[in-house]
């Protein structure tokens, strides 16, 4: 038995200079797992609660000492003596201890950090890599895939201080033979984009996720400069590289309208879906995330009707990694993919349940970071261990993003042909 003998919580810093929760789980025999909770900027209203202290005299109210005290107090007391390999049982103990729908008593940041640390400790106890342990927890032992990266090379919206409304413009190196080659392609495009922007006299400062954040006159202009960079880097857009958007539309949804203030345009629900469809006809955009507000379910039905057969429509704020909400989406034919952020739901077990449910319904699952990250690279192991096939973890810049890519390189080196890189076949509507 992988007996838990200690649980330790502490306050550490995330990539935006805000505190977050880190946890350690110690087992008999000297096995230790350590993990940190990420934090989002554009968040869905139904996400599990990230517990902050609210004490304006510390970290402008963003401290997490209460959540840390919950780790070191009630969570520790409840888990001492338990078996770390029994992940579902551990997570249920913490969920029951919290007793709320959205984990607002103990904090999803406290529960998640411990949940992931326990998984890492259990993997160490079993003498196997984390991705292999996750595959076993998922009921899919030995089934792996290297994910196609969605590389966020140009930022707008809540992730940048500029006049671009769409939050993320991403490249996907679908023509690569393996993950290592995909990473190289993305890096070359990233550096070429910097030259293109510099040549136009535009800013090459970066946003929260490492993408550039220049002032451009329209969202179409953002796509045009990316196209230029891809081609200048020696790649063919639509064959070697495809494009993906994260609209984060809830951020510019006001009074039932979609207000693209950067462009000076206002759309109704169907009009904004038509606008996005027109972009997919001009550029090889194969994936659109949060193309409408999380509450605009009628609009989502229309968007899925006009684009769902050819374009991957990803629900992030829409589904918030929640199986109850995903069930409603599946039953109503809303979207065809789910973004997986484990801090939206607050435990590894619930995260795996959402991935399994999505796959069973023919939806894809895209594993994702948050804009506030740490050096913790658990999502790399999660992507491979569930064979999710796609990952969003930012640009080729900032060590909090690159840490995940580097972990994926290590995993691919270990697994070789046991973890295929399937490129475009992983993306809904493109197989």
From Swiss-Prot:
Obligatory cofactor(s): Mg(2+)
Entry GO terms, CC: cell surface; extracellular region; phosphopyruvate hydratase complex
Subcellular location, principal: cytoplasm
GO molecular function terms attached to this record: magnesium ion binding; phosphopyruvate hydratase activity
Alphabetized SUPFAM superfamilies for the sequence: Enolase C-terminal domain-like, Enolase N-terminal domain-like
CDD domains for this protein: enolase
Cofactor binding remark: Binds a second Mg(2+) ion via substrate during catalysis.
Subunit structure: Component of the RNA degradosome, a multiprotein complex involved in RNA processing and mRNA degradation.
Protein name, as recorded: Enolase
Organism expressing this protein natively: Shewanella sp. (strain MR-4)
Gene that encodes the chain: eno
């Amino acid at each position: 038995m992988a007996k838990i003998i200690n649980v330790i919580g502490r306050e550490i810093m995330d990539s935006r200079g805000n505190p977050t929760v880190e946890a350690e789980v110690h087992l008999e025999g000297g096995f230790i797992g350590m993990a940190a909770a990420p934090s989002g900027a554009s968040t869905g209203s139904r996400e599990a609660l990230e517990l902050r202290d609210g004490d304006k005299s510390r970290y402008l109210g963003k401290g997490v000492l209460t959540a840390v005290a919950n780790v070191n107090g009630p969570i520790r007391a409840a888990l001492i003596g338990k078996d770390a390999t029994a992940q579902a049982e551990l997570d249920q103990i913490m969920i029951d201890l919290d007793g709320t729908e959205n984990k607002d008593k103990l904090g999803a940041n406290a529960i998640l950090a411990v949940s992931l640390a326990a998984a890492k400790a259990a993997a160490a106890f079993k003498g196997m890599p984390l991705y292999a342990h996750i595959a076993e927890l998922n009921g899919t032992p030995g089934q792996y895939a290297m994910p196609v990266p969605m590389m966020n090379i140009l930022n707008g919206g809540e992730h940048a201080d500029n006049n671009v409304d769409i939050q993320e413009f991403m490249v996907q190196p679908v023509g690569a033979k393996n993950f290592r080659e995909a990473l190289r392609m993305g890096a070359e495009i990233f550096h070429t984009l910097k030259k293109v922007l510099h040549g136009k006299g535009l800013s090459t400062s970066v946003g929260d996720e490492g993408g550039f954040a220049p002032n451009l006159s329209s969202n179409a202009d953002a796509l045009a400069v990316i196209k230029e960079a891809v081609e200048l880097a020696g790649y063919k857009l639509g064959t070697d590289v495809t494009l993906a958007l994260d609209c984060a539309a809830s951020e510019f949804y006001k009074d039932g309208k979609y207000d693209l203030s950067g462009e000076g345009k206002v759309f109704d629900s169907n009009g904004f879906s038509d606008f996005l469809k027109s972009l997919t006809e001009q550029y090889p955009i194969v994936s659109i995330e949060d193309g409408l507000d999380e509450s605009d379910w009628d609009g989502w039905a229309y968007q899925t009707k006009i684009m769902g057969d050819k374009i991957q429509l990803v629900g992030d704020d829409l589904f918030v990694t929640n199986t109850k909400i995903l069930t409603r989406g599946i039953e109503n034919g809303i979207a065809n993919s789910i973004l997986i952020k484990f801090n939206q739901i607050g435990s590894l077990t619930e995260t795996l349940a959402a991935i399994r449910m999505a796959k069973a319904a023919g939806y894809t699952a895209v594993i994702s970071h948050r804009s506030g990250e740490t050096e913790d690279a658990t999502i790399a192991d999660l992507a491979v261990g569930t064979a999710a096939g796609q990952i969003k973890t930012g640009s080729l810049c900032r060590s909090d993003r690159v840490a995940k890519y580097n972990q994926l390189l290590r995993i691919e080196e270990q697994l070789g042909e046991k973890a295929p890189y399937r490129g475009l076949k992983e993306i809904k509507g493109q197989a």
